[in-house]
Amino acid sequence: MKRPSSHGRRPPQGPSQRQLRAGELVRHALVEIFREEEINDPVLAGVSVTVTEVRVSPDLRHATVFVEPLGGEHADEVVQALNRHARFLRGHLGRAIELRFTPELKFLHDESFNEAARMAKLFDDPKVRQDLTPQPPSDSWKDED
């Protein structure tokens, strides 16, 4: 009996080692660019931006950059400003890294910090905490003589 054909497709996989290395290379370079270059935008003036992760496409031509503004305030405005200056940042990135193609940059707000804070608050809820604490075993199943 024949196995069902997957029509030449492999099952979905995570990023390759090449993508992971390129993502880290781009992340480190962007951190240096943010530290050294002045971006003329009133929204970005005086704002420190943390680059938390960079995900690179399999062909290394596109990079999604996850950022978190220090303090988490005005995150949407900061992300919009970074996307407006993506070409400027890509130009500096091309001079800072050695890849065949400099990836196009798309900036997104990293929601993982907010999600972690929400989960921590949820676990501190007394109703949830009572379900998380171990209960002493019940002796009701034992026969009493």
From Swiss-Prot:
**Entry keyword set:** Cytoplasm, Ribosome biogenesis
The ranges of region (Disordered) come to 1-21, 124-145
Please, which domain of life does this record's source organism belong to?
Bacteria
Q: How does it assemble?
A: Monomer. Binds 30S ribosomal subunits, but not 50S ribosomal subunits or 70S ribosomes.
Q: Which HAMAP family match?
A: RbfA
**Which organism's genome codes for this protein?**
Phenylobacterium zucineum (strain HLK1)
Please give one Gene Ontology molecular function term for this protein: ribosomal small subunit binding
- What Pfam families does this protein map onto? RBFA (PF02033)
Source organism phylogeny: Bacteria, Pseudomonadati, Pseudomonadota, Alphaproteobacteria, Caulobacterales
Q: What does this protein do?
A: One of several proteins that assist in the late maturation steps of the functional core of the 30S ribosomal subunit. Associates with free 30S ribosomal subunits (but not with 30S subunits that are part of 70S ribosomes or polysomes). Required for efficient processing of 16S rRNA. May interact with the 5'-terminal helix region of 16S rRNA.
Q: Where in or outside the cell is it found? A: Cytoplasm
Keyword Cytoplasm listed? The answer is yes
Family per UniProt? Belongs to the RbfA family.
Q: Which GO terms describe its cellular component?
A: cytosol
GO BP annotations of the record are:
maturation of SSU-rRNA
Descriptive protein name: Ribosome-binding factor A
Where does this protein have compositionally biased stretches of type Basic residues?
Answer: 1-10
- List the PANTHER family hit by this protein, alphabetically: RIBOSOME-BINDING FACTOR A, CHLOROPLASTIC-RELATED (PTHR33515:SF1)
Which SUPFAM superfamilies does the UniProt record give?
A: Ribosome-binding factor A, RbfA
